[in-house]
């Protein structure tokens, strides 16, 4: 195996791009590297679903992402709110694309399949780039939530999406000097650059916690997220085929990688949620009536007014004791 080749990778892991790279078959004439083992298909309502377990996890990941986005949106004044929510929007788009590919909605060997896989690769690079830029937000090098901060994140993520997408589709289609057997550029973009982005993010968050925070609990979120992410990659690329054989093709490495990636993304959310504070005066909670009066004040403690004169013709008016319920406060 040479540097940049996908031969050994695709034999261990049933990645979608594996059917688009490698030498042409002498029999069929089509490209593709067949993995040693891959999860069996399932039939549901006369429909064949590929990678059933991984596809089910993608659906769970979508639900969890929606919940995390709603919680982020509720923290109205938290630092880096707009930036981190962009990261989760990209993750949601990547999950939808992965679900479409893994479940076989766009089957391999079909015309649109290379384009969908190229989009998946592009979203992967955009996600890692978004994570990298989010790593600098906490240092307040520039004001978070401003047009500069938000568009810096969006533009860098878009650029990396375009680079990864173009290199992938050029490789799959044998355009521009690239080919399914010349995968070095795609390997560098998908593995080397993305790994650098993740590593820089981790270093920046360690510096942020150690230099600016007294609480060390956020380090636990970072450590756990890193461990599960590494575990998922090791299982998929080193032991995926072994696990697949031992469970009779019900699961493969892609299932465990998807699960571990979800946990790692959840730890990114937990870390951000833990280190961010917000001004309670302007916060918007998910639950209504964040402020409420538990009991009424005694009569002697109530605010007196000029209308307390019992001789007044308005003393018995129903408007005398009216209380406003605006924002849960009594007036």
From Swiss-Prot:
<keyword id="KW-0653">Protein transport</keyword>
<feature type="transmembrane region" description="Helical">
    <location>
        <begin position="184"/>
        <end position="204"/>
    </location>
</feature>
<dbReference type="GO" id="GO:0006031">
    <property type="term" value="P:chitin biosynthetic process"/>
</dbReference>
<dbReference type="GO" id="GO:0006457">
    <property type="term" value="P:protein folding"/>
</dbReference>
<feature type="transmembrane region" description="Helical">
    <location>
        <begin position="150"/>
        <end position="170"/>
    </location>
</feature>
<keyword id="KW-0961">Cell wall biogenesis/degradation</keyword>
<dbReference type="Pfam" id="PF12271">
    <property type="entry name" value="Chs7"/>
</dbReference>
<keyword id="KW-1133">Transmembrane helix</keyword>
<comment type="subunit">
    <text>Interacts with chs3.</text>
</comment>
<feature type="transmembrane region" description="Helical">
    <location>
        <begin position="52"/>
        <end position="72"/>
    </location>
</feature>
<comment type="function">
    <text>Chaperone required for the export of the chitin synthase chs3 from the endoplasmic reticulum.</text>
</comment>
<feature type="transmembrane region" description="Helical">
    <location>
        <begin position="84"/>
        <end position="104"/>
    </location>
</feature>
<dbReference type="InterPro" id="IPR022057">
    <property type="entry name" value="Chs7"/>
</dbReference>
<keyword id="KW-0812">Transmembrane</keyword>
<dbReference type="GO" id="GO:0071555">
    <property type="term" value="P:cell wall organization"/>
</dbReference>
<feature type="transmembrane region" description="Helical">
    <location>
        <begin position="219"/>
        <end position="239"/>
    </location>
</feature>
<keyword id="KW-0472">Membrane</keyword>
<comment type="similarity">
    <text>Belongs to the CHS7 family.</text>
</comment>
<protein>
    <recommendedName>
        <fullName>Chitin synthase export chaperone</fullName>
    </recommendedName>
</protein>
<feature type="transmembrane region" description="Helical">
    <location>
        <begin position="113"/>
        <end position="133"/>
    </location>
</feature>
<keyword id="KW-0256">Endoplasmic reticulum</keyword>
<dbReference type="GO" id="GO:0005789">
    <property type="term" value="C:endoplasmic reticulum membrane"/>
</dbReference>
<dbReference type="GO" id="GO:0051082">
    <property type="term" value="F:unfolded protein binding"/>
</dbReference>
<feature type="transmembrane region" description="Helical">
    <location>
        <begin position="249"/>
        <end position="269"/>
    </location>
</feature>
<dbReference type="GO" id="GO:0015031">
    <property type="term" value="P:protein transport"/>
</dbReference>
<keyword id="KW-0813">Transport</keyword>
